[in-house]
């Protein structure tokens, strides 16, 4: 299928040649506001007030997760468009310029896919089609408002223990469970990161999105290996050793993820060099390395992995273990290549007790300008290029008990944007 943007180019050409296509209804798309290109901001630009124009170019995104999808009315294309417009208008009103939409939470698709079944978050049942293409509508409506849209997917997760949605018969994981290319563990199902077949499916799934939709980016979050348990992939590791492999289990796991990340990056760039590929790992570096088995340092020193990193620095300034300012600095210091640094921020903590923060456990309950100060602080970091907010509900549909606190935080955040 042709991307809307590519269709537009053809339309523009037709207009230039004076062909009748100009009169067609497709011409309406020319009202689209220009989208910003965040990939070209020079390092350190705009860390002062004089750099205000550069600040405006910074990445400012909102995560819209599968937990938010139920708020969208999927009864018809018209109803869906109206509910999407509300979401996007909220993002614009906050001064954001991007939305990161979860399109593959559970080895499924919130768009027309030849590889994955329709997601249960769209119609309530995996494999059931809504009768229109939600992603196509979201991309078009976002671009009309000058918002970029990134497609966020979970590469390995098929289902977690909390998801009761039945796998549809056509879900590729159904057959792959029988061959060890997908693994059932602790009530959850995950694609086997060591499986070449699973890896290829994930890469093909990314390529399909970039080919068929005018998305501005592909986004992975912090879920990679679901466990540290040696039993999880013991069969695959034994096979690797039998074949003469000498890496330790943990290094081998990290290399499995590295292979996937490199392959996804290559597929994205081959399909459309303008599309970015970024990953949002945990803010806790040790967890990334030892529990998720991701080698972030490789991604931030060698080329060919990612375009941006967006660590989830969901910590306040007074967090005993990971104080915000020092954690941002530590992440910035890791970067030795051209990878852009975005900071994942945690409005979901506003007005609540931060249980594991030690001396900072009441910080989010007692302050009204943490997010604003976090953005200001991040701007001092050498590689900082923007932020993302987790998540839409926490900002625009907060629990009644924290509504006033959220409003206060968002008002102060707007002051620094």
Model regions and ranges:
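Sec-dependent signal peptide cleavage junction
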Residues: 19-39, 47
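Active-site-adjacent "subsite" loops/lids of carbohydrate-active enzymes
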Residues: 53-81, 150-151, 156-212, 360-364
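The substrate-binding groove and active-site-proximal loops of carbohydrate-active enzymes
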Residues: 67-78, 116-131, 185-200, 246-257, ...
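Aromatic- and glycine-enriched glycan-recognition loops and surfaces
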Residues: 75-94, 121-145, 255-260
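Catalytic domains of carbohydrate-active enzymes, especially glycoside hydrolases
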Residues: 82-109, 212-216, 304-308, 384
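Aromatic-lined carbohydrate-binding/catalytic grooves of carbohydrate-active enzymes
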Residues: 94-130
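Polysaccharide-binding and catalytic clefts of secreted carbohydrate-active enzymes
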Residues: 145, 173-302, 314-315
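Substrate-binding cleft of secreted/luminal carbohydrate-active enzymes
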Residues: 303-322, 330-331, 337-417
């Amino acid at each position: 299928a042709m991307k809307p943007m590519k269709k537009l180019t053809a339309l523009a050409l037709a207009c230039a040649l004076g062909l009748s296509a100009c009169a067609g209804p497709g011409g309406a798309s020319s009202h689209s506001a220009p989208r910003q290109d965040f990939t070209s901001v020079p390092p350190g630009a705009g860390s002062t007030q004089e750099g205000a124009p550069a600040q405006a170019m910074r990445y400012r995104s909102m995560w819209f997760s599968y937990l938010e999808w139920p708020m969208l009315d999927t009864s018809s294309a018209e109803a869906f468009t109206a509910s999407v417009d509300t979401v996007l208008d909220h993002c614009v009103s906050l001064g954001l310029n991007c939305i990161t939409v979860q399109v593959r939470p559970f080895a499924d698709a919130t768009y027309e896919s030849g590889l994955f079944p329709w997601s249960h978050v769209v119609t309530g049942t995996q494999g059931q089609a809504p009768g229109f293409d939600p992603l196509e509508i979201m991309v078009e409506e976002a671009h009309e408002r000058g918002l970029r849209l990134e497609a966020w997917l979970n590469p390995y997760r098929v289902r977690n223990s909390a998801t009761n949605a039945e796998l549809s018969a056509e879900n590729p994981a159904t057959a792959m469970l029988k061959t060890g290319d997908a693994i059932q563990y602790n009530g959850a199902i995950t694609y086997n990161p060591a499986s070449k077949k699973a890896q290829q499916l994930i890469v093909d799934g990314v390529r399909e999105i970039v080919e068929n939709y005018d998305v501005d980016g592909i986004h992975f979050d912090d879920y990679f290996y679901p466990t540290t348990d040696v039993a999880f992939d013991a069969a695959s590791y034994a096979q690797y050793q039998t074949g003469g492999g000498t890496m330790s289990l943990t290094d081998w796991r990290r290399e499995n993820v590295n292979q996937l990340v490199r392959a996804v990056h290559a597929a994205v760039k081959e399909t459309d060099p303008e599309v970015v590929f970024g990953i949002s790992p945990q803010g806790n570096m040790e967890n990334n390395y030892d529990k998720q088995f991701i080698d972030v340092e490789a991604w931030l020193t060698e080329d060919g992995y990612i375009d941006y990193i967006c660590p989830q620095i969901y910590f306040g300034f007074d967090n005993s273990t990971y104080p915000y300012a020092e954690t941002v600095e530590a992440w910035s210091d890791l970067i030795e290549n051209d990878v852009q640094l975005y900071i994942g921020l945690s409005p979901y903590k506003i007005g609540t007790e931060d249980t594991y923060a030690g001396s900072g456990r009441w910080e989010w309950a007692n302050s009204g300008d943490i997010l604003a100060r976090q953005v200001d602080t991040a701007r001092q970091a050498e590689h900082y290029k923007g932020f993302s907010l987790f998540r839409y509900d926490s900002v625009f549909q907060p629990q009644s008990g924290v509504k006033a606190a959220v409003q206060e935080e968002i008002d102060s955040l707007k002051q620094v944007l």
